[in-house]
Every structure is written in C-alpha cells, then in structure tokens.
A protein has these predicted regions:
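Predominantly late transmembrane helices and immediately cytosolic-facing juxtamembrane segments
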Residues: 2-13, 193, 197-207, 211, ...
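Alpha-helical transmembrane segments of multi-pass membrane proteins
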Residues: 25-39, 266
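Membrane-interface helix termini and inter-helical loops of multi-pass transporters
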Residues: 36-50, 110-115, 162, 170, ...
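Structural signature of hydrophobic alpha-helical transmembrane segments
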Residues: 55-66, 113-128, 169-185, 218-225, ...
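Entry/N-cap segments of selected transmembrane alpha helices
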Residues: 77-104, 173-185, 271-297, 320-324, ...
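Transmembrane alpha-helices that form the ion-translocation and gating core
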Residues: 93-131, 288-344, 361, 365-376
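Hydrophobic alpha-helical transmembrane segments in multi-pass integral membrane proteins
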Residues: 104, 163-164, 213, 217, ...
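Functional cores that coordinate and move charged inorganic groups
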Residues: 134, 138-140, 144-231
Length: 384
C-alpha cells in the first residue's frame, strides 16, 4: 500500500520528471565514458524497420512530446495565459531576439574562419530540457512563466527548423511536403466539422509525421500541427474536451518515459583530449557566450522593447527576474544545437566533438544559472 502511494505521489509531482531527466543525463554521460559505450551506441544504431533506434527516439517519440506541448499551448491560447494578444505576442518577440542575438555573437567571434558555418548553433533551445528544469522548481515558478517558456521554445524550434530547411538541408522533397499539406487540410476539415473522436485525428497524424520526415523537414513539427487541430470544445460542457483528454492521457508517458529515454539517447557524449582547450577559442566562445549571454540578452531585450511599445505585457504575476531566469533556461541548447553542429561540420569529426563539448558546457551553465535565479526569485517572493 505504501509503495502504491509512493508511486502515485511520484507521478503526480511535476518535480519528479525533472529530477528523473537529470538522472538520465548523468547516467548517459557515465555510460558514454565507460567500457559500455560501444555496446550502448550499438543499441542506438540498431535498425528497427527502416530506421535506427536513435531516429525512432528523436523523430518518433519526440513528435509525441511536441504533440503534448502543442496541446498545452493551444489550451493556453484559447483559455489561459496566452488568450489575449499582449500575452501571446511576447513569446514570439522573445524567441526572435533569442535567435538573432546568439547568431550575431557567434558570428562576431567566428566571422571569416572555418567555424563560420555554425552560426545557427547558438540559436536553438532544447525544449525538453528547459521545461524539465522548470518542472524541478515546481510551484515556486509562476505558471505564466512556464507557459511563456514553452511557447518561446516552440517558436524557437520552429525558427530552427526553418533555418535548417533553408541553410542546412541538401534537398527538400516537395512531393512529400505537398502530401503533408493535404493531410493538414484533412485535419483542419475534421476540426471544422466538429469530429470529436481522437482516432480520426491520430491516424492522419501518423501519415503527417511520415510525409514530414520524408520531405527533409524535421518530423517533430508534425506533433505541433496535429495538436492545433485537436478540438478544444466538448459537446457537453461538464465533460473535458478531446484536447484536455488527450493532454491528460499523454502527460505521464511523456514526462516519465519519452523524455528520460530522449535524455539517455542524446547526451551520451564521449569526452576526448583537447575538448577543454576548444572552449577557450573563438569557436568555444561563440557557442558558450551565444547560448548563455545571447539568449539572456536577446530574449529580454526584445521582450523589453515589445512591452515598452505596449505591444506585449509581462506574464501574469512575474517580474523581470523571472524573465531573466527564463532567458537563461532557453540557453539550454543540448540536442537541437548538437543537431545543427553536426549539419554545420559534416566533414570534420574534430569540430563536431568540440562543438558538442561547448554545447554541453553552455547548457549545464545556462540550466544551473537559470535554476538558481528562479529559485532565488521564489525565496524573495515568499519573504515579501
């Protein structure tokens, strides 16, 4: 009985998922730098059908994660923190600043060098890890800041996907993109005609994922698109809507299975000689300062301008110290930054390894600083 109660409390506690994710990162790094590294990598490279285990995790399972985040954002846009224009516009301005300033900082350090192609590395935010840190803080962070960071990260990821498609993708398969468009039209029609059954959305959603993946565009975007077509109204107001039902159903598997698996598979970075030296070079400075200072300055500067121009407003019950904390957490680049680094330096394993270490270092620093800042803000709020 006590064990059942423990698991019930564990899975209902938002902080538990963040702690579990950090634990998985630690385990993954330990495995990557032990004798088990080769065997672990072999598991990730193992083919299941046409794709590797790693691909199924990064493009398949993470599409489900993006589906959940998309559902949460849609709910907030319709009924919650983002339901008015001033609140909804702020994450967009913040994300734009959070992409432009880091890219400028990296370019300042690396313009005209062999590293210059990696200008987009510092633009990315790893939404899974940034939201996990927020989850660890529990109720000490205003709910509006959590929603702001989630929306910002979604816009940031959309921006990164567009950048990858334009600057880093060798070829876009327009026929598959056209098929994706047809599926989106079908999903929109289902919503328009008030079809409520989840199955009628989920089956086309699988096809949307398949077509997106084969088009050359990152398939996780299919999860967000699908989420925005799920009906948010129920036939009976006393019952939860299809959106709310699906969101509730996905919460535990995403938080306690998909995200930990993602962490295990994507932070297995092997430390090599010379990696630390790479931090103290224009290349390392561009990545580290881009992710930490670039995100912090860009997000808060563009937010400040939008608020001063009365286009946007600060999230409910939040202060600029909360915005600074969110800006730092957005500097957790991790997997998205590593993905862009791999595309930027396809022909240089040495540069890929140096980029991975710089991204890992910057992400740990940004996450730690953001956590401490938001934790301190909560203490100050409680003392008032």
């Amino acid at each position: 009985m006590r064990i059942t109660k423990f698991f019930k409390e564990f899975f209902s506690n938002s902080q538990s998922s963040g702690v579990l994710l950090v634990l998985c990162v630690t385990i993954s790094l330990m495995i990557a730098n032990s004798s088990a590294a080769t065997g672990f990598q072999a598991i990730l490279d193992k083919m299941i059908g046409p794709y590797s285990v790693s691909m199924w995790i990064n493009d398949g399972l993470m599409a489900v994660f993006f589906l959940l985040v998309g559902l949460e954002i849609k709910r907030e846009l319709l009924k919650g923190e983002l339901s008015n224009f001033k609140n909804a516009s702020l994450p967009i301005f913040a994300a734009i600043g959070g992409m432009i300033v880091p890219a400028i900082i990296f370019t300042i350090f690396n313009h005209g060098t062999e590293y210059s192609n990696g200008w987009a590395i510092s633009m990315a935010t790893d939404i899974a890890f940034s939201l996990a840190i927020v989850a660890m803080l529990g109720k000490s962070v205003p709910s509006a800041i959590k929603v702001f960071l989630a929306a910002l990260a979604i816009v940031d990821d959309l921006g990164a996907i567009i950048v990858i498609a334009i600057f880093y993708t060798d070829e876009i398969h327009w026929n598959y993109l056209a098929f994706s468009g047809l599926v989106i039209v079908l999903l929109a029609a289902l919503n328009y005609f008030k079809v409520k059954k989840h199955i009628f959305y989920l089956i086309p959603g699988v096809f949307l994922w398949y077509f997106m993946h084969h088009s050359g565009i990152h398939a996780t975007i299919a999860g967000v698109i699908l989420a925005f077509t799920i009906p948010a109204n129920s036939e009976n107001e006393s019952e939860p809507s299809p959106l709310e039902k699906l969101e509730h159903f996905l919460h535990i598997p995403v938080s306690f299975a998909i995200m930990p698996i993602f962490a295990l598979a994507n932070t297995n970075i092997t430390f090599k000689a010379g990696m630390v030296d790479g931090l103290f070079s224009s290349f390392g400075y561009g990545i580290v300062f881009g992710l930490i200072l670039g995100k912090l300055i860009g997000i808060n500067l563009f937010s400040f301008i939008a608020i001063k121009l009365k286009i946007s407003s600060l999230p409910d019950r939040s202060r600029w110290i909360h915005m600074a904390g969110a800006g730092l957490l957005a500097g957790i680049g991790f997997t998205m930054s590593i993905f862009i680094a791999l595309l930027s330096y396809k022909d240089s394993q040495e540069l890929q390894d140096s980029a991975k270490f710089a991204i890992l270092t910057a992400s740990i620093l940004a996450g730690s600083l953001g956590y401490l800042l938001l934790k301190n803000a909560a203490k100050n709020d409680n003392s008032i």
